[in-house]
């Protein structure tokens, strides 16, 4: 399945237009996809069960295929009434701005994000920190359009799956269009990972 990328005339990271597309069951749809990903990572079923599941997945893909849309039309990422705006890619999390000018919240990695030996896959941590730090840059500076220039992660401890973890993040400095940010992920009092990143504000119309 391939689609030509349709650039937005206003450039990259334009504010998404809110929608109610998908109706009242879109949240169930997103959560169902997440559960399916977890089962796909964990399942040890008999061959005939896998065959039946594969058949049903092909049927489901055929059902949805005629309705594929570009990123500007899909409700994914535009359902403001749902957690993470209904984006199925994002690590489940919740964040808020604190009174002292930082961003705090929680995140929970699922079975789908498992690497080996009970540890979250390192790439999944990259996805979380990119989301958290991008949000931090936007919320704390008021910048609406920026892209990641670099992201560095220091892995201190094994990060567990299926457990609510805590993060905090802040803006370290700004230099023109550059926004330097950092964050920490904890399990209670235990520091699990640290990250720092540079985000660059986009110029008008810049992709």
List each language-model region with its residue ranges.
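Long amphipathic N-terminal alpha/beta scaffold segment
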Residues: 50-120
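Hydrophobic core residues within well-ordered beta-strands of beta-rich domains
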Residues: 89, 101-103, 149, 165, ...
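A short secondary-structure junction signal
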Residues: 115-119, 165, 181
């Amino acid at each position: 399945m391939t689609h030509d990328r349709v650039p937005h005339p206003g450039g990259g990271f334009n504010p998404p237009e809110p929608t109610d597309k998908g109706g009242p069951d879109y949240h169930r749809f997103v959560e169902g996809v997440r559960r399916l990903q977890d089962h796909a990572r964990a399942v040890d079923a008999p061959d005939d069960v896998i065959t039946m599941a594969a058949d049903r997945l092909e049927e489901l893909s055929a059902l949805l295929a005629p309705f594929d849309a570009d990123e500007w039309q899909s409700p994914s990422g535009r359902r403001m009434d749902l957690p993470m705006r209904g984006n199925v890619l994002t690590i489940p999390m919740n964040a808020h701005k604190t009174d002292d000018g930082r961003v705090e919240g929680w995140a929970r990695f699922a079975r789908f994000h498992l690497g080996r030996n009970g540890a979250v896959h390192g790439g999944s941590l990259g996805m979380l920190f990119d989301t958290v730090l991008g949000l931090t840059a936007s919320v704390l500076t008021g910048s609406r359009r920026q892209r990641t220039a670099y992201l560095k992660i220091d892995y201190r401890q094994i990060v567990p799956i299926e457990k609510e973890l805590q993060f905090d993040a802040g803006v370290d400095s700004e230099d023109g269009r550059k926004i330097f940010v950092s964050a920490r992920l904890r399990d209670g009092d235990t520091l699990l990972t640290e990250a720092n990143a540079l985000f660059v504000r986009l110029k008008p119309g810049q992709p």
